[in-house]
Amino acid sequence: MAIVKCKPTSPGRRFVVKVVNKELHKGAPHAPLIEKKSKSGGRNNNGRITTRHVGGGHKQHYRLVDFRRNDKDGIPATVERIEYDPNRTAHIALLCYADGERRYIIAPKGVSAGDQLIAGALAPIKAGNSLQLRNIPVGSTVHGIELKPGKGAQIARSAGASAQLIAREGVYVTLRLRSGEMRKVLAECRATLGEVSNSEHSLRSLGKAGAKRWRGVRPTVRGVAMNPVDHPHGGGEGRTSGGRHPVSPWGFPTKGAKTRGNKRTDNMIVRRRK
């Protein structure tokens, strides 16, 4: 994987920084594992905008990714290829199991075409293998972690993400997340060894506003540029700073205000994130 800085042959290419991976599959995705993906333009069934800054963008197909891997225990799989997925920052890997079935998984870092992967309690400690947390050694790096047994991976799924298993006590294990948070998870939950691929994703630069539009992201208008009817920061004579602590268009504090409200699982968090 290489970081390529484009030559400034035009204003739109002057600031472009690409992440080039020559191992990525250049053809179409595996047809049985794709589904139609409709665009909402950020509107709900009443046609009203419920999510701002959404609309347009290139047409995409959704890739059906296996986040559970619990019904293929003990069946070895070969990595056929690594693919780009427009629906996520990580790359995906197409596995061909010994029984002939093919499935997509989140591609772990260091896994390439031809590698052998397996899931289950007897799987060796190797990047890309999926085990229950009770069977993973303390100190290991993991990703694709379940919060409820059998529900599928929910933690550490984006490019370069991972967590470290730092303790095992009774029916729980303790994980240290990239955010600095330490939390307990049931040892029955599954995780995949290693970290997620495409860790260089954060080093790229789109270079121009149009590249953001290709991805279906519309412009964000500053509150201080609006009228008072549209935003709490709006109005004023000339250019103003808003005159109050930063808030959302609905008056809720923004820029760092804590929004977590799930008291039911507070006891699972050993240390809050930084």
Curated annotation (Swiss-Prot):
Q: Record keywords: RNA-binding included?
A: yes
Q: Does the keyword Ribosomal protein apply?
A: yes
SMART domains tied to this protein:
Ribosomal_L2 (SM01383), Ribosomal_L2_C (SM01382)
Q: Which Gene3D superfamilies match?
A: 2.30.30.30, Nucleic acid-binding proteins, Ribosomal protein L2, domain 3
Q: Name one GO biological process term.
A: cytoplasmic translation
| UniProt xrefs under Pfam families | Ribosomal_L2, Ribosomal_L2_C
Record keywords: Ribonucleoprotein, Ribosomal protein, RNA-binding, rRNA-binding
| Residue ranges, annotated region (Disordered) | 28-55, 224-274
Q: Which GO terms describe its cellular component?
A: large ribosomal subunit
A GO term for molecular function: rRNA binding
Q: Which SUPFAM superfamilies match?
A: Nucleic acid-binding proteins, Translation proteins SH3-like domain
**Stated role:** One of the primary rRNA binding proteins. Required for association of the 30S and 50S subunits to form the 70S ribosome, for tRNA binding and peptide bond formation. It has been suggested to have peptidyltransferase activity; this is somewhat controversial. Makes several contacts with the 16S rRNA in the 70S ribosome.
* Assembly: Part of the 50S ribosomal subunit. Forms a bridge to the 30S subunit in the 70S ribosome.
For this chain, the family text in UniProt reads: Belongs to the universal ribosomal protein uL2 family.
Family annotation (HAMAP family) = Ribosomal_uL2_B
Q: Please give the name of this protein.
A: Large ribosomal subunit protein uL2
What are the leading ranks of the lineage?
A: Bacteria, Pseudomonadati, Pseudomonadota, Gammaproteobacteria, Pseudomonadales
